[in-house]
From Swiss-Prot:
Record field: transmembrane: 67-87, 119-139, 140-160
Zinc-finger listed as a keyword: no
Location within or outside the cell: Membrane
Keywords: Membrane, Transmembrane, Transmembrane helix
Protein name: PRA1-like protein
GO cellular component, one term: Golgi apparatus
GO molecular function, one term: small GTPase binding
UniProt key word Transmembrane: yes
Amino acid sequence: MSALSLSITKVSETFSEIYASRAQYLSGFKSVGEFLDVRRISRPRNFSEAQSRISFNFSRFSSNYLAIIAMLVIYALIRNPLLLIVIGIGVGGVYGIRKLQGADLQLSHRVISNQNLYVILACVLIPLGLFASPIETIIWLVGASCVCVFGHAAFFEPPVESAFETVEQQV
């Protein structure tokens, strides 16, 4: 009975930690109107201004940028269904093998050890994974994320109030 209460306590602690981290993450989101304010988009005069804009906007819009990257990951997986299937087979296979809890799999009069199940899963996933072109997807994802995030951060002007904040900090 104490093991059950211990696991319930651990589950409730885990959910409270997830809720707290989710609340902290969501508090960092800026509104869509503020994030996509077209009036504040301009070309930086030089590279140092672009660097300062990127630094400021990364700290200000980090949650929004993470949401954009998450949406790009979802889009990349939808765009490459074979990779999504390979990931599903891999997760399902590992889950099924772990469900055995270290015991061997018995199929009628054959016994397959736990290690052999992992080898079989790897032998199935490696060729399928190479055929699903994960490297192309990762390269596309890195490129699209950099263009979206760095492009927004470099071309989006900081608000006028931020200039006064730096002056106040220096005084």
